[in-house]
């Protein structure tokens, strides 16, 4: 079957404005000098589509930006990455979703987010048909896609499966109540790719195997759970399971690492790799991004990422 693209990445597209290192917020009108300020295409879709493109995939961006200068920058940045933006909607009268991230010296950061076009976006019928022509369809941002959450997301994934797509799913900052949005989607999801913090918030345990089994029992074909500094855990419906340790790198900022992991995993799936190799590529992708500032930082190419996958030292896991 001929596919229009390797992957359609649907969901939240956010402009991140990052500064590092931020040791304090100066009182009043005080000034703090920092080393670097960076703009990045982010969000659970934006932070995934850029790694997909840099890892050699024909990527299609599917989402929305506003009618402001942030939208101009975002669309130009996506085009510079070689990403097809034909299905990116530009909403009149809406701001582009954006986040300010003051990164502390230890890599942690508070999040100051302004909801915008991504929260208002609902995929149009003709856009949905076009998005389902790719080999893989990824939906990212469940819980923050206020106009898409629920029945519209179910319909998108149903149509993707009916069209023969491999489907992947991610969410953002899940809470217990997010589970009600996720459950109806799982029968149409081949790979559910949350973080352990998100799964534990929904399921009530931080045991990766128990979390993965829970979501597989609800219908997911497989679950790949990112474990932060401990790597990731993968379980499939047929009983296969394994842990891939993280790589030992000098971490500067973890913004977008989970989305980069997803992008790396998708890049392996698009090449029909074994799942263990997909997870290793995903882990290397996230490790490289963690060494820089913001989503997609320091990620150069598929070849360089494979080299890192095969040569970076492995981090000793903290999780027992």
Question: What does each of the following model-derived ranges do?
Answer:
Residues 1-64, 69-80, 250-252, 316-320:
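Glycine-rich phosphate/adenosyl-contacting loop at the front of the ribokinase-like
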Residues 1-8, 33, 159, 208-320:
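Conserved phosphate-binding/catalytic region of the ribokinase-like
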Residues 2, 130-132, 186:
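A short, aliphatic-rich alpha-helical micro-motif
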Residues 59, 85, 167-168:
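Hydrophobic beta-strand scaffold residues
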Residues 77-94:
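A glycine-rich helix N-cap at a beta->alpha junction
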Residues 90-91, 101-146, 150:
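Conserved phosphate-binding/catalytic loop of the ribokinase/pfkB sugar-kinase fold
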Residues 158-166, 172-241:
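Conserved phosphate/ATP/ADP-binding segment of small-molecule kinases
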């Amino acid at each position: 079957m001929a596919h229009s693209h390797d992957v359609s990445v649907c969901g939240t597209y956010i402009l991140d404005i990052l500064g590092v290192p931020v040791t304090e917020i100066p009182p009043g009108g005080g000034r703090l000098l920092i080393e670097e300020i960076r703009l990045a295409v982010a969000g659970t879709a934006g932070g995934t589509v850029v790694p997909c493109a840099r890892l050699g995939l024909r990527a299609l961006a599917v989402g929305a930006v506003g009618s402001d200068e942030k939208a101009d920058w975002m669309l130009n940045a996506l085009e510079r990455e070689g990403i097809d933006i034909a299905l990116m909607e530009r909403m009149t009268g809406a701001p582009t979703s954006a986040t300010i991230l003051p990164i502390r010296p230890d890599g942690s950061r508070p999040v100051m987010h302004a909801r915008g076009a991504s929260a208002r976006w609902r995929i149009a019928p003709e856009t949905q048909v076009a998005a389902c022509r790719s080999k893989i369809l990824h939906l990212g941002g469940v819980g923050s896609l206020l106009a898409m959450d629920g029945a519209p997301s179910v319909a998108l994934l149903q149509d993707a499966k009916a069209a023969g797509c491999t489907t992947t799913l991610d969410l953002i900052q899940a809470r217990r109540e997010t589970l009600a949005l996720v459950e109806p989607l799982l029968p149409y999801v081949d790979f559910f790719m949350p973080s352990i913090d998100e799964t534990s918030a929904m399921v009530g345990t931080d045991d990766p195997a128990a979390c993965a089994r829970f979501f597989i029992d609800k219908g997911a074909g497989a679950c790949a759970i990112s474990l932060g500094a401990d790597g990731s855990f993968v379980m499939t419906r047929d009983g296969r399971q394994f842990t891939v340790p993280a790589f030992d790198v000098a971490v500067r900022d973890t913004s977008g690492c989970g989305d980069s992991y997803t992008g790396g995993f998708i890049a392996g799936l698009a090449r029909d790799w074994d799942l263990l190799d997909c997870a290793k590529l995903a882990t290397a992708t996230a490790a490289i991004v963690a060494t820089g500032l913001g989503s997609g930082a320091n990620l150069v190419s598929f070849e360089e990422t494979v080299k890192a996958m095969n040569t970076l030292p492995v981090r000793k896991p903290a999780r027992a």
